[in-house]
Amino acid sequence: MAERPLDVIHRSLDKDVLVILKKGFEFRGRLIGYDIHLNVVLADAEMVQDGEVVKKYGKIVIRGDNVLAISPTEE
């Protein structure tokens, strides 16, 4: 049986993920919520550029239309 995209995201709950946005911004943080529109809530969120943290946000909501990719980070 094929794996559904939301299954991958669900398994990433309470784990660190990398969220890549359409305009090239990247955020790293702990995924604490999402919905079917791919709106995501990150805790301990950081904006990352070239692998370096450029700003810390704490808890943020990212609108799903801006999301290009969500990737579980290496543990």
From Swiss-Prot:
Gene3D superfamilies: 2.30.30.100
Family stated for the protein in its record: Belongs to the snRNP Sm proteins family.
Biological source species: Pyrococcus horikoshii (strain ATCC 700860 / DSM 12428 / JCM 9974 / NBRC 100139 / OT-3)
Annotated protein name in UniProt: Putative snRNP Sm-like protein
Keyword field: Ribonucleoprotein
GO biological process, one term: mRNA splicing, via spliceosome
InterPro entries for this protein: Lsm6/sSmF, LSM_dom_sf, Sm, Sm_dom_euk/arc, snRNP_Sm-like_arc
GO molecular-function terms, A-Z: RNA binding
Domain Sm, residue spans: 4-75
SUPFAM superfamilies, A to Z: Sm-like ribonucleoproteins
CDD domains: archaeal_Sm1
GO cellular component: ribonucleoprotein complex; Sm-like protein family complex
